[in-house]
Amino acid sequence: MAKKSKQLRAALEKIDSTKAYSVEEAVALAKETNFAKFDATVEVAYNLNIDVKKADQQIRGAMVLPNGTGKTSRVLVFARGAKAEEAKAAGADFVGEDDLVAKINDGWLDFDVVIATPDMMALVGRLGRVLGPRNLMPNPKTGTVTMDVAKAVEESKGGKITYRADRAGNVQAIIGKVSFEAEKLVENFKAFNETIQKVKPATAKGTYVTNLTITTTQGVGIKVDVNSL
């Protein structure tokens, strides 16, 4: 604990809490000040000036990072017949119907992404209390309720991330690992930022991005200058 506190203090000394950095500077600092003994995740956190109580200001979606996330997702697909075979051919880790529902209800959760064809949603709906709180419930907005299961599986395996604004307008997302080259992290960030800008609600007023930070697992939040984007 003492060693970790010392490392945290050392990291804090390198970061000026009164300054907002460029994306390139923030990424470099995030890599430099990371003291985790594992390949830490690099995350971005936005605070958006939106009112999610209004239906037209709710933000939710998915996108594929150009350089991936550095993590191989375990993909589960609810499908039958030809679509089940399509999912298997695309590399899905688990494919099934009622058998998977029973397994999940028994406590099995060794997967990261759930995809379903539309006709399977009545079945998947039985798992709402299990999948919903874990943000695993398939949803058309994130491309996880689809007939194109091959594409959905390939994207999930290839760096697809989902995002959603919480009640306070906060949006968090993974943009890679500390082991990534800085340029690749910057590219991933810029791709995600472009997505966030594109989904800005037409009815949102004032400054859209009010705060933005980049951090690593167990690391220190580094403020990004939103005016530099």
Swiss-Prot record:
GO terms classed as biological process: regulation of translation; translation
Keywords: Repressor, Ribonucleoprotein, Ribosomal protein, RNA-binding, rRNA-binding, Translation regulation, tRNA-binding
The organism's place on the tree of life at top rank: Bacteria
Entry keyword Disulfide bond: no
Coiled coil: none
Gene Ontology MF terms in the entry: rRNA binding; structural constituent of ribosome; tRNA binding
GO cellular component annotations of the record: large ribosomal subunit
Mitochondrion listed as a keyword: no
NCBIfam families cross-referenced by the UniProt entry: rplA_bact
Family per record: Belongs to the universal ribosomal protein uL1 family.
Subunit-level organization: Part of the 50S ribosomal subunit.
Biological function: Binds directly to 23S rRNA. The L1 stalk is quite mobile in the ribosome, and is involved in E site tRNA release.
Protein name in the entry: Large ribosomal subunit protein uL1
Organism of derivation: Streptococcus pneumoniae (strain CGSP14)
